[in-house]
Design a protein with these regions (language model features):
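Iron-sulfur (Fe-S) cluster-binding modules
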Residues: 1-8, 22-35, 39-61, 65-143
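N-terminal glycine-rich "phosphate-gripper" loop used for MgATP/nucleotide binding
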Residues: 10-14
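Short, well-ordered alpha-helical microsegments
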Residues: 16-18
């Protein structure tokens, strides 16, 4: 069917569309979506952003709730103080990430995780655009 097609309409994210382009060099490929985030399906037609692929995962000490993604300000050392009724001051439709993190850590008896001051995130580790190779590097011959 692809051979007969004049073009390809990709329903994938931007990465998926680019993968198709690399494999179908003789056909135009058009994206049907504007990728805004890496997310999860909440329910049909509703999605939640889950990861910004920052290169320094914070989930181990935050009880599995990402402050980089879930906090509108990307704060790493606790809430900004602007939340009202558990909602984010930047977008009141969203729960405050730090209230969620606090509640989660309390429920798993790990509130001590909040005592350490976190250094600013090193976003250079995300190094956009990135590539990844799973091939083993050949050992360099020693002279």
């Amino acid at each position: 069917e692809i051979k007969e097609a004049d073009a390809i309409l990709s329903l994938a994210c931007g990465d998926g569309t680019q993968t198709i382009v690399k494999n179908l060099k003789d056909k135009p490929v058009y994206p049907a979506n504007n990728t805004l985030f890496i997310g999860e399906v909440r329910r049909v037609g509703e999605f939640e952003e889950a990861c910004k692929a920052c290169g320094e995962c914070e989930l181990a000490w935050t009880g599995g709730i990402c402050p980089v993604t879930m906090c509108a300000k990307g704060l790493l050392n606790g809430a900004c103080g602007g939340a009202r009724d558990g909602k984010c001051e930047v977008n009141p439709e969203n729960d405050c990430a730090w209230i969620l993190i606090y509640d989660r850590l309390k429920s798993i008896n790990q509130l001590d995780n909040l005592l350490d001051i976190k250094e600013p995130k090193d976003y250079s580790k995300s190094g956009n655009p990135r590539s990844l190779s799973l091939k083993k590097k050949e050992a360099t011959a020693k002279a």
